[in-house]
């Protein structure tokens, strides 16, 4: 057995000694932020990501007070964290974000559904033009923050026509 193997085994034994904890999504987000603050510049939460997209929770156990008994997933492109029951969201966010970026780079336009007040991504068009291999089962939107894709419907901007002043002044 190598010296490196001894260290790895010890790390696994230490993790097994930690209690199992049930954490909220907000508690996990705070733990991930603490982890990022303590890392060197240029290192972000994606280093916690396993191949299946889930977070390597034993690596942040010290911030949680134990090893979480749940599974959480991370979007590599948007850095958002999701509970296990929402694991399809980060999968689609990542693929659609890359497709939107590619489409924007090639055409100079955003792939938005025509007349969409919410900047809904036109996933059908991205699929038809081979930017996507599948269409998500839910709507996605482009935010005004660095053209990031989100699954949350933004608040609609007020309709300018509806706000026209139709009052009269009597003299």
Task: Tell where the protein language model's regions lie, with residue ranges.
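Short acidic linear motifs
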Residues: 1-171
């Amino acid at each position: 057995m190598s010296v490196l193997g001894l260290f790895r085994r010890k790390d696994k034994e230490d993790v097994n000694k930690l209690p199992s904890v049930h954490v909220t999504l907000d508690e996990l987000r705070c733990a991930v932020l603490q982890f990022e603050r303590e890392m060197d510049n240029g290192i972000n939460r994606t280093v916690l990501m396993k191949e299946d997209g889930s977070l390597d929770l034993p690596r942040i156990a010290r911030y949680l007070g134990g090893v979480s008994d749940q599974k959480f997933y991370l979007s590599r492109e948007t850095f958002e964290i999701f509970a296990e029951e929402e694991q399809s969201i980060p999968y689609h966010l990542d693929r659609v974000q890359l497709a939107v970026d590619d489409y924007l780079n090639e055409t100079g336009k955003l792939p938005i559904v025509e007349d969409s007040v919410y900047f809904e991504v036109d996933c059908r068009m991205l699929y038809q033009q081979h930017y996507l291999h599948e269409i998500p089962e839910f709507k996605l939107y482009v935010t005004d923050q660095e053209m990031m894709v989100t699954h949350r419907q933004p608040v609609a901007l007020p309709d300018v026509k509806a706000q026209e002043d139709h009052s009269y002044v009597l003299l």
